[in-house]
């Protein structure tokens, strides 16, 4: 029998991991949340070492995501994809910046090729990245897939600003912890 629906969830602990009423005004606070989510996901054994959060123009939290690929047996359950989905469901729009102005995505690590593409379609205007793709591959053993040689330039052409290396050392530590455990799928 073919399945007629897909049901993806965040782990129960995720609601205790952040203050939904907090003001995440600066980029460091946004990135800190993404890295915290990635670390908690590893600590709880609820998925891979990745966290992401979507923020409104005012710095308010719209949605979060953590990697849930293994628990849900689906390759699309990356942290960024989960953050997009929870945010899109919350605001009931597939293009997050359609009516709200500039939207920011903070990620614990550079998006893989799938999440990179989804960032364009989800309506992201700013992308805050912690660890680099080479960190993900060397420390945790993941294959991030093919990205355009000038991936930053491609995003810039679409009006998406990229800021890298925010809390990179903290994000790298989470990846290294996960990599040492040998849990790469």
Where are these regions (language model features)?
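Zn2+-dependent cytidine deaminase-like catalytic core
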Residues: 64-173
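Short beta-strand scaffold segments in enzyme catalytic cores
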Residues: 50-59
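Active-site/ligand-binding-proximal alpha/beta "capping" segment
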Residues: 179-185
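Short, basic/aromatic recognition patches
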Residues: 19-46
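Conserved hydrophobic/aromatic pocket- or pore-lining residues that grip, position, or stack substrates
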Residues: 34, 51, 83
